[in-house]
């Protein structure tokens, strides 16, 4: 029987969890993330549609996510939506640490009825968003569909990832957005996975990300 002390450090998975808080005059946001979770989610942002999308991320990326937010939603959802994206991005970056051993790249195409969305991402350390959604309505329920892009802008900038989103088909706004979040989650699940062939190695020819 081999004890854990006999296992090389490079094969021991680090704790990939983070908790981040952000407080401004407009919002108060707390995010806890566990990249090696099982898809559990508790999302209470005051924005029901955003909560639903955060649940898609947790479920389809198989991460545990706890997001609490209060904000000036009596004005509109913009500040809370953006600050949740910022805080989630910061928590994701912190949980990834030095990124040793991760696959780094992820890609997925998700269908939802008539909608089809392609997502590719890279935890490169270089924030970039290429956003190609054409959402036909201004709102889904009470949620302003312009805020989808604002959420991903905030998330990308603060997680330092490169993210490409392409809508291949779709006419229903809810389906397009939900397919996007599902594709993003599945691509992220691939990218954050540990590659046993690269255990303890930063996945870059430069040696740093």
From Swiss-Prot:
Single GO BP term: L-histidine biosynthetic process
GO CC annotations, alphabetized: cytoplasm
Gene3D superfamilies (UniProt xref): Imidazole glycerol phosphate dehydratase, domain 1
Top-rank EC class of the record's enzyme: lyase
Keyword terms, alphabetized: Amino-acid biosynthesis, Cytoplasm, Histidine biosynthesis, Lyase
Pfam families for the chain: IGPD
Catalytic activity, as annotated: D-erythro-1-(imidazol-4-yl)glycerol 3-phosphate = 3-(imidazol-4-yl)-2-oxopropyl phosphate + H2O
Record-listed E.C. numbers: 4.2.1.19
Molecular functions (GO terms): imidazoleglycerol-phosphate dehydratase activity
Keyword Amino-acid biosynthesis among record annotations: yes
Localization in the cell: Cytoplasm
InterPro entries from the UniProt entry: IGPD_sf, ImidazoleglycerolP_deHydtase, ImidazoleglycerP_deHydtase_CS, Ribosomal_Su5_D2-typ_SF
Pathway info: Amino-acid biosynthesis; L-histidine biosynthesis; L-histidine from 5-phospho-alpha-D-ribose 1-diphosphate: step 6/9
Keyword Amino-acid biosynthesis: yes
Signal peptide segment: none
Coiled-coil annotated residue ranges, if any: none
PANTHER family membership: IMIDAZOLEGLYCEROL-PHOSPHATE DEHYDRATASE, IMIDAZOLEGLYCEROL-PHOSPHATE DEHYDRATASE HIS7
Similarity annotation: Belongs to the imidazoleglycerol-phosphate dehydratase family.
Protein name: Imidazoleglycerol-phosphate dehydratase
């Amino acid at each position: 029987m081999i004890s854990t002390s006999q296992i090389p450090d490079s094969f021991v998975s680090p704790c990939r969890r983070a908790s981040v808080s952000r407080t401004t005059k407009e919002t108060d946001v707390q995010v806890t993330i566990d990249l090696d979770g099982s898809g559990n989610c508790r999302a209470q942002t005051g924005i029901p549609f955003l909560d639903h999308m955060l649940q898609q991320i947790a479920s389809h990326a198989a991460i545990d996510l706890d997001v609490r937010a209060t904000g000036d939603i009596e004005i509109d959802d913009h500040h809370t939506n953006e600050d949740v994206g910022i805080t989630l991005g910061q928590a994701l970056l912190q949980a990834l640490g030095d990124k040793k051993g991760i696959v780094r790249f992820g890609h997925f195409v998700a269908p939802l009825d008539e909608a089809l969305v392609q997502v590719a991402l890279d935890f490169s350390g270089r924030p970039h968003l290429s956003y190609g959604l054409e959402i036909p309505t201004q709102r889904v329920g009470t949620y302003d569909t312009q805020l989808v892009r604002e959420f991903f802008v905030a998330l990308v900038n603060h997680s330092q990832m490169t993210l490409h989103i392409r809508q291949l088909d779709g006419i229903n706004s809810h389906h397009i957005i939900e397919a996007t979040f599902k594709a993003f989650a599945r691509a992220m699940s691939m990218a954050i996975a540990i590659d046993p062939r690269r255990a303890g190695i930063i996945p870059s020819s430069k040696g740093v990300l």
